[in-house]
From Swiss-Prot:
Gene Ontology biological-process annotations: defense response to bacterium; programmed cell death; response to salicylic acid
Catalytic activity: L-seryl-[protein] + ATP = O-phospho-L-seryl-[protein] + ADP + H(+); L-threonyl-[protein] + ATP = O-phospho-L-threonyl-[protein] + ADP + H(+)
Annotated organism of origin: Arabidopsis thaliana (Mouse-ear cress)
Signal peptide: 1-24
Top-level taxon in the UniProt lineage: Eukaryota
PROSITE patterns assigned: GNK2, PROTEIN_KINASE_ATP, PROTEIN_KINASE_DOM, PROTEIN_KINASE_ST
GO CC annotation terms, alphabetical: membrane
Keyword Transferase among record annotations: yes
GO molecular function, one term: protein serine kinase activity
Induction: By salicylic acid (SA) or by a bacterial pathogen infection. May be regulated by WRKY DNA-binding proteins at the transcriptional level.
Protein name, entry field: Cysteine-rich receptor-like protein kinase 5
Length: 659
C-alpha cells in the first residue's frame, strides 16, 4: 500500500513539474508599455471594424514570416488602421504567438479605445482611426529607461559611444531591403560592451526610416545604461547587455526552428530487488525541491499582493518615492549654482526662483528653488515631481531630478537656452527674431506637447497654467511646455473636475474655470487659443484694446476684427508681409474655435493638431468667445445670449482701468 501511495504521489509530482515546464515554455511576451486614447462606444461601427481587424491581424499566418503586416477595415470616419511589427530576429512562430497574445491583451488593456499602441520585447501592435504608422512625426510614443545611471566621469564618452553606435545601426536598418532591422555591438571598454537595436516598419522608404530613427535617437537620454524609444513607425534601443540574437558581421543569425530539447536527468541503475529503496530515494530528492518551489511561489505571491495593494491605496499625486532615483544631494545643487548666485538667476516663478547651474559632469541645468515661506509650495512641488517624472516628449521640458532636504524643495530641469516665449514675444527689440515661420512652428509644437499630456501619455494631465511665460525655447526655437506645479491628473474615464481653489493666470483661464472652478482638457484648449492669438499679434491678452469707442482684451479685439472681415489687422507688424495669408487666417480661425464659451464647441487638441497640419480639413464657424466685452451698439443674437453672462464678471478676470 505504501509503495502504491508513493507511486501515486510520484505521478502527481511529475505532473506538477511537467506543468511548470510547459508553463515556462509557453511564457507570455514581456510587456513594456502601452498608450490608449479616445474612448469609443462598443456599439459603434468603428468598434465592430476594430474587432474584425484584430482577428484578421492575429490569424493570417501568411505574414508572420515577414514579421510585419498592416490592414485597414471600414470606410471614411469608421476606418481602422492596424499594424503589427515583430522584432527582426524573431521566428515566425514566436511572432505569431506574440501577435495573438497582443490582440487579446489589447481588449483588456484598452477596452473601447480608438487609438492604441502596445509594446513587448518581442513585438508591437497598434491601431488608430488615422494612419499613424506612416507618420514619422507623431505624439504617440512609448519611452522606457534603465534605472541605473552612468557615472559622471564616464558620461561624455558613454554618450558619444552610444550615439555613434545608434547612428550606424540606423543607417544599416534604413538600407536593408527586407525587415529594416539592424543590431550592432561595440566595445566600450575591455570588460564592457554596448548593444543597439533599431527597426522601422518595412513600408517606410529608406529616407523616412532614417528620419524616424534619427528623431527617436534624439529622444533617448544616454546618461542611463539602457533605454528604448518607440513610435508607431520605428523603434530604437540600447543596453549594456545582449538582448538580441548574436550576430556575425552584422547579419542576424536566424533562430533555431524549434527549441532544443531540455537535457534529461539520468536515473541511476539499481540492483534487482531494490525498487522500493529507489522509490524512496527519488522521493527523498524530489519532494524537498518541490516543496521549496511551492513555498517560494507562495511567499512571492504574498509579497506581490501586498505591494499591489500598497500601490493601489497610495495617492499618486503625493507619492514621490517612485522618483527616488532622480534625487540630487543639496550640496551638489548648491555647488552647481554657485550657492544660488544672483549672476545665475534666470527668473522668478509663482513659487520661487529659477537659476542656471552646471552639474559636475558638465551638464547645464535649470534649477527651480521653491520659496521657503511659500505655504502652498510643498504640494505643488510634490505634484510637479510625480507628474513630470513620467513625461517624455520633445515639446515638454525634461525633469532631470529633484532635491528635498530639510526646508529645501528644488526641481532640476534640462537647461533651455533661449529663455521663455514671452521674452521674445512681448519685447519690441526681440520680436524680429520670431518670423512667421518660427511662430507657426512654435504653435504646432505647443499643440503637440499639450496633445501628449491630454491623450498620448500614460496619464491624462491637465496643465491648468498654459501661458507664454511657461513655454521655453531651445537653441533651435523649438517650444517646450514647462511648469507643471498646477497640473492635475485625471482618471481614465474622467472628463472634468472641480476645485474651490482656482490657480493659474487670469487672462488665460477659461470662463468655466475662473468663475466656477470647473476644469477639463477644454480648459487647456481655451488657454491654447489665447496663446495662439498672442503669438500671432505679439500682444498680451491682459492689455486693453480700443475699437469703435469700446474696450476689450485681445480675445474680444480679435473677435471684432474677425466679425468685421479684417482678421489680418491682428498680425504683428514686425513680420509684415512675410507670411502666407491663408495660413495665418486659418490659425486665427482655429484660435477663435478654442476660446468659444461653450466647452462642447471647442475642439480637442487632437483635432487642433490635425487642423494645423492638414489644410484640407474644413473648420467650423466660430461662436463668440468667453469673457466677451460687447460694445453698446452690439446686440446679443442667438449665439451671443450666453456670452452676456460672462461680461458681468469680466472685470474680475482681466483687470480694467477706470474709464
Amino acid at each position: 500500500m505504501s509503495a502504491y501511495t508513493s507511486l501515486n504521489f510520484l505521478f502527481l509530482l511529475t505532473f506538477f513539474i511537467g506543468s511548470l515546464r510547459v508553463s515556462a515554455q509557453l511564457q507570455d511576451p514581456t510587456y513594456v508599455g502601452h498608450v490608449c486614447t479616445n474612448r469609443i462606444s462598443r456599439n459603434s461601427i468603428y468598434f465592430s471594424n476594430l474587432q474584425t481587424l484584430l482577428t484578421s491581424l492575429s490569424s493570417n499566418n501568411a505574414y508572420f514570416s515577414l514579421g510585419s503586416h498592416s490592414l485597414t477595415k471600414g470606410q471614411n470616419s469608421d476606418m481602422v488602421f492596424g499594424l503589427y511589427l515583430c522584432k527582426g530576429d524573431l521566428s515566425p512562430e514566436s511572432c505569431r504567438e506574440c501577435v495573438i497574445f497582443a490582440a487579446k491583451d489589447t481588449r483588456s488593456r484598452c477596452p473601447g479605445g480608438k487609438e492604441f499602441l502596445i509594446q513587448y520585447d518581442e513585438c508591437m501592435l497598434g491601431y488608430s482611426d488615422r494612419n499613424i504608422f506612416m507618420d514619422t512625426v507623431t505624439t504617440t510614443t512609448i519611452i522606457t529607461w534603465n534605472t541605473q545611471k552612468v557615472t559622471a566621469d564616464q558620461s561624455d564618452r558613454f554618450n558619444d559611444a552610444v550615439l555613434s553606435l545608434m547612428k550606424k545601426s540606423a543607417e544599416e536598418a534604413a538600407n536593408s531591403t527586407s525587415k529594416k532591422f539592424a543590431v550592432k555591438k561595440s566595445d566600450f571598454s575591455s570588460s564592457q560592451s554596448l548593444y543597439a537595436s533599431v527597426q522601422c516598419i518595412p513600408d517606410l522608404t529608406s529616407e523616412d526610416c532614417v528620419m524616424c530613427l534619427q528623431q527617436s535617437i534624439k529622444e533617448l537620454y544616454f546618461n542611463k545604461v539602457g533605454g528604448r524609444f518607440l513610435v508607431p513607425s520605428c523603434n530604437s534601443r540600447y543596453e549594456v547587455y545582449p538582448f538580441y540574437k548574436e550576430t556575425i558581421e552584422g547579419t542576424v543569425l536566424p533562430p533555431p526552428v524549434s527549441a532544443p530539447p531540455l537535457p534529461l536527468v539520468s536515473t541511476p541503475s539499481f540492483p534487482p530487488g531494490k525498487g522500493k529503496n529507489s522509490t524512496v530515494i527519488i522521493i527523498a530528492i524530489v519532494v524537498p525541491v518541490a516543496i521549496s518551489v511551492l513555498i517560494c511561489v507562495a511567499v512571492f505571491s504574498f509579497h506581490a499582493s501586498k505591494r499591489a495593494k500598497k500601490t493601489y491605496d497610495t495617492p499618486e499625486e503625493d507619492d514621490i518615492t517612485t522618483a527616488g532615483s532622480l534625487q540630487f544631494d543639496f550640496k551638489v545643487i548648491e555647488a552647481a549654482t554657485d550657492k544660488f548666485s544672483m549672476c545665475n538667476k534666470l527668473g522668478q516663478g509663482g513659487f520661487g526662483q529659477v537659476y542656471k547651474g552646471t552639474l559636475p559632469n558638465g551638464v547645464q541645468v535649470a534649477v527651480k528653488r521653491l520659496s521657503k515661506t511659500s505655504g502652498q509650495g510643498e504640494k505643488e512641488f510634490k505634484n510637479e515631481v510625480v507628474v513630470v517624472a513620467k513625461l517624455q516628449h520633445r515639446n515638454l521640458v525634461k525633469l532631470l531630478g529633484f532635491c528635498l532636504e530639510r526646508e529645501e524643495k528644488i526641481l532640476v530641469y534640462e537647461f533651455v537656452s533661449n529663455k521663455s516665449l514671452d521674452y521674445f514675444l512681448f519685447d519690441s527689440r526681440m520680436q524680429s527674431q520670431l518670423d512667421w515661420t518660427t511662430r507657426y512652428k512654435i504653435i504646432g509644437g505647443i499643440a503637440r506637447g499639450i496633445l501628449y499630456l491630454h491623450q498620448d501619455s500614460r496619464l491624462t494631465i491637465i496643465h491648468r497654467d498654459l501661458k507664454a511665460g511657461n513655454i521655453l525655447l531651445d537653441a533651435d526655437m523649438n517650444p517646450k511646455v514647462a511648469d507643471f506645479g498646477m497640473a492635475r491628473i485625471f482618471e481614465i474615464d474622467q472628463t472634468e473636475a472641480h476645485t474651490r481653489r482656482v490657480v493659474g493666470t487670469y487672462g488665460y483661464m477659461s470662463p468655466e474655470y475662473a468663475m466656477y472652478g470647473q476644469f477639463s482638457m477644454k480648459s487647456d484648449v481655451y488657454s491654447f487659443g489665447v496663446l495662439v492669438l498672442e503669438i500671432i499679434s505679439g500682444r498680451k491678452n491682459s492689455s486693453l484694446y480700443q475699437m469703435d469707442a469700446s474696450f476689450g482684451n485681445l480675445v474680444t479685439y480679435t473677435w471684432r476684427l474677425w466679425s468685421d472681415g479684417s482678421p489680418l489687422d491682428l498680425v504683428d507688424s514686425s513680420f509684415r508681409d512675410s507670411y502666407q495669408r491663408n495660413e495665418i487666417i486659418r490659425c486665427i480661425h482655429i484660435a477663435l474655435l478654442c476660446v468659444q464659451e461653450d466647452t462642447e464647441n471647442r475642439p480637442t487638441m487632437s483635432a487642433i493638431v490635425q487642423m494645423l497640419t492638414t489644410s484640407s480639413i474644413a473648420l467650423a464657424v466660430p461662436q463668440p468667445p468667453g469673457f466677451f466685452f460687447r460694445s453698446n451698439h452690439e446686440q446679443a443674437g442667438p449665439s451671443m445670449d450666453k456670452s452676456s453672462l460672462c461680461s458681468i464678471d469680466a472685470a474680475s478676470i482681466t483687470i480694467l482701468a477706470p474709464r
